[in-house]
Curated annotation (Swiss-Prot):
InterPro entries the record matches: Glc/Gal-6P_isomerase, GlcN6P_deaminase-like, Glucosamine6P_isomerase, Glucosamine6P_isomerase_CS, NagB/RpiA_transferase-like
Active-site residues, as the UniProt record annotates them: D66, D129, H131
Coiled-coil segments: none
Naturally occurring in which organism (per UniProt): Escherichia coli (strain K12)
Record gene name: yieK
GO molecular function list: glucosamine-6-phosphate deaminase activity; identical protein binding
Family annotation (SUPFAM superfamilies): NagB/RpiA/CoA transferase-like
GO biological process, one term: N-acetylneuraminate catabolic process
Superkingdom field: Bacteria
Recorded family membership: Belongs to the glucosamine/galactosamine-6-phosphate isomerase family.
Top-level taxonomy: Bacteria, Pseudomonadati, Pseudomonadota, Gammaproteobacteria, Enterobacterales
Name by which UniProt lists this protein: Uncharacterized protein YieK
GO CC annotation terms, alphabetical: cytoplasm; cytosol
């Protein structure tokens, strides 16, 4: 594992963008699974200025690693919609380079990735509860590949307020996510973390026991893991 601690969110975003660009600059096909949410917003802003209008990045293919469909609506779900707003549309990513995981195709997702050469890099955020992708405490098992989970109980509130602007009418019955086994199969992982609210989670993930109670703790076992965190997020780590 390699850990980079930056001064602030802006530096974290810039360093992460350049790390991602290093993979995108290869001359062969590059497969990248990337995260939505608030943490990567700055990273995508930097990255857009570096790749927009440059056809030599057309060898890069982008995958979402989870998806929440909108109840009662045809078309794309929450994650791809957010990734379009954050990066695909501003950066001018071609439609054929966007590889969508959906509630309809998730059963074939791992086989599809294997046929296409696997993932070169997965860019992950970290939840304050230690979740990654759609792998939540008390839900995920480490042996799972791409999987469908029901949305029920307290998760209905989490999805409604966290992903759907509080609109309970849009909450679906289930969502899909790449499970721990699928993520661990990627060649390289990058976790980006910002803010004091993630400090305890980052400590648990990197320096605590590997346990399904903290799903992202399994990532410390990956042979090629990079973590980029700002000082606030790294404040609880035992360094030295």
């Amino acid at each position: 594992m390699k850990l980079i601690i930056t001064e602030d969110y802006q530096e974290m975003s810039r360093v992460a963008a350049h790390h991602l660009l290093g993979y995108m600059s290869k001359t062969r096909r590059v497969n990248l699974a990337i995260t939505a949410g608030s943490t990567p917003k700055g990273m995508y802003e930097y990255l857009t200025t570096l790749v927009k209008g440059k056809p030599w990045y057309d060898n890069c293919y982008f995958y979402n690693f989870d998806e929440i469909p909108f109840r009662g609506k045809e078309g794309e779900g929450v994650t791809i919609t957010n990734l379009r707003n954050l990066f695909f549309t501003p950066a001018g990513i071609k439609e054929e380079n966007i590889q969508k995981l959906t509630i309809d195709n998730y059963r074939e997702h791992d086989q599809k990735l294997a046929r296409e050469g696997g993932l070169d890099l997965v860019v992950l955020g970290l939840g304050a509860d230690g979740h990654f992708c759609g792998n939540l405490p008390n839900t995920t098992h480490f042996h799972e590949q791409t999987v469908e989970f029901p949305i029920q109980g307290e998760m209905v509130d989490i999805v409604a307020h966290g992903e759907l602007g509080g609109d309970f009418s849009l909450v679906p019955d289930s969502y899909v996510t790449m499970g721990p086994k699928s993520i661990m199969a990627a060649k390289n992982l990058l976790i980006i973390v910002s803010g004091a609210g993630k400090a305890q989670a980052l400590k648990n993930v990197l320096q605590g026991p590997v346990t399904e109670d903290v799903p992202a703790s399994v990532l410390q076992l990956h042979p090629s893991l990079m973590v980029i965190a700002d000082k606030a997020a790294a404040a609880e780590l035992a360094l030295g």
